[in-house]
Amino acid sequence: MRFRVILGKADDLKADVLFQMSVPASAETPLALEGFLTGPTSTRASTLPVHQKIRIHSQRVVGEGTEILGHSILTEPAFWTPNVPMLYFVKCRITSSGKELALLSQTTGLRRLGIRNHSLWLDGHRFVLRGVTCSNRDYSSAEQQPAAPEDHRTADVLDLPAEVFSETDSVELEIDENLKTADEIGRPIIIRLHPKSPPSVIPSVICRLASHPSVFLTVIPNTLLPEVSKFSAYKGTMLFAKETHAKFAPPELPNGIDLAVVRLSQSVPDSSWKTPPPYPVIAWQTGVPSQRQECDRLQALLANWRTAPKGPPSSWDWAGYFVGDETIPHQA
């Protein structure tokens, strides 16, 4: 069953939360939904729990299945941030004439992530994304846990191998358990899809990734860019990025892509980047260690470049900084 959480109109007092469920079976009679939203829980904070009913907002036949849209209203909602990773638990049971068709139990988080001008904004504040490349790290082992509270804000950049994709709608990701742990500890995650990913399963993959509040950004390879408008509707508040190289002029982004990740093989970008593009840009320095302090070094280096003569306007700055080498090349 394909499932995704949609955060509607939300503020500190109230949040409209929608739950889209695609059941791979059509029924002669309308389906019934018994669902509840409970929480929040967090590894760093506590608050009074709620037990909110999920009601059917609408349902329709789509292809050979049925799509149900559930709805719940939360008062004084708790939103997910790296500092305070608040999580809710969703449990839904879908029946037809008393017969169970699908059962769902899943944790999720409500994350207010978006773009304002050239920056990322999280929960009403500018958020500079700093990340290091790594393999599919096992967060369940003690040695992989963050060494200090301030480290949880550093994102992991993960390459998603093509082997994790399935030709069925119930796509199982090898890193799913690690993403759940990242949700709990508040570590942002950047996902790079494999260039050989089959387009037919991408909507299910995007729904799966978007259900994890820790997954801030998914990098779409060039091979999937022609299809991006078809599956961008599934991403919710998760952002899509395109990779490019700093030796080329800033590209025009396809519809559905929110920002660019610019690869730096030299110390500074081409001079054409001193005229900022109309979208956020994250700088990625390869050939350096995958360490948090390298993000600071890159930020200082690019700050000098930015303030040099004929540099970008003082109101512009980079939206984030990645360091380290990738394991899956996206470009030749």
Task: List the predicted regions and their residue ranges.
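Secreted/periplasmic carbohydrate-active enzymes, especially glycoside hydrolases
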Residues: 1-191, 199-258, 263-332
